[in-house]
Regions:
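Pepsin/retropepsin-fold aspartyl endopeptidases
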Residues: 1-105
Length: 105
């Protein structure tokens, strides 16, 4: 899911667990649009593909299962993560609304 209003990119906690990615606690927390707070853990990714795009190694926030489930229910499909403004900016994201396509460099 592309969320241009999200400052950061998040991965689904269940996906992170399934891929056996180690997580690290932080002192930060975040909240959803209803004010539900969740601790902000991070996972270091080294080899992740988004379609044909190879995402460079970096640390990404982990979205708690509760918040991820809410987003999936609203979207009526499973959400594996949110692409936020941080990734869209650093990877020069272009959103083509006519073809509903996302291009990353």
């Amino acid at each position: 899911l592309v969320d241009t209003g999200a400052f950061n990119t998040f991965l689904d906690a269940a996906l992170v667990a399934d891929l056996h990615m180690p997580t690290q606690r932080t002192e930060m927390a975040f909240s959803d649009f209803r004010g539900q707070r969740s601790e902000a853990n991070i996972a270091r990714i080294t080899d992740l593909l988004l379609g044909d795009f190879h995402l460079p190694a970096q640390k990404l926030f982990v979205l708690s299962n509760g918040l991820s489930a809410d987003a999936s229910r609203i979207a009526e499909t499973h959400i594996f993560g949110l692409l936020g403004a941080d990734l869209l900016t650093t990877q020069h994201g272009i959103i083509d609304l006519e073809s509903m396509s996302l291009f990353l460099k």
